[in-house]
A protein has these predicted regions:
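Conserved "HGTGT" condensation-loop signature of ketosynthase/thiolase-family condensing enzymes
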Residues: 1-131
Length: 131
C-alpha cells in the first residue's frame, strides 16, 4: 500500500488518474490477496482502471522481474493495450477491478503503476506516464 501511495504522492498523481496497474501477482493466495486488498483500498474511488499480472505470461524472473514488468508497463502505455492475466479462468467474483483475464484489452492508458515486491519487505511501485 505505502509503496503505491508514495509513488502517487511523489508524482503528484491521484489514485483516480491511474489507468493500469501491472500487479506483482505471483499467483500465491497470500501475496496476491495482500496486493489486491491494498489496491482495492487505495483505488477505492477509481472505477475505471485495469490490473493484470504479466508474470502469468513470462513466469517469475526473480531479480529481473521488476525490470521486465516495467518494460511491459511502458509498452502497455505506448501501445494503449492492457496485457492479459493468462490462465485467469475463475476470477474472484466480488472483485470489481478489471483483471484483464485471458486476452489483452485495448484501452486508454495515460498513467500506469508497476509493482515489485520482494522477500523481507523490499517493495517498489513505479509510476509511468504517457508523453
Amino acid at each position: 500500500y505505502r509503496a503505491m501511495e508514495n509513488a502517487l504522492k511523489d508524482a503528484k498523481v491521484t489514485p483516480e488518474q491511474i489507468d493500469y496497474i501491472n500487479a506483482h501477482g505471483t499467483s500465491t493466495k497470500i501475496g496476491d490477496g495482500v496486493e489486491l486488498n491494498a489496491v482495492q483500498t487505495l483505488f477505492a474511488n477509481n472505477k475505471n482502471f485495469s490490473m493484470s499480472s504479466t508474470k502469468s505470461s513470462i513466469g517469475h524472473l526473480l531479480g529481473a522481474a521488476g525490470s521486465v514488468e516495467a518494460i511491459f508497463t511502458a509498452l502497455a502505455i505506448r501501445d494503449q493495450i492492457a496485457p492479459p492475466t493468462i490462465n485467469l479462468h475463475n476470477p474472484i467474483e466480488d472483485v470489481k477491478i478489471d483483471l484483464v483475464p485471458l486476452k489483452a484489452k485495448e484501452r486508454e492508458i495515460t498513467y500506469a503503476l508497476t509493482n515489485s515486491f520482494g522477500f523481507g519487505g523490499t517493495n517498489a511501485s513505479l509510476l509511468l506516464k504517457r508523453i
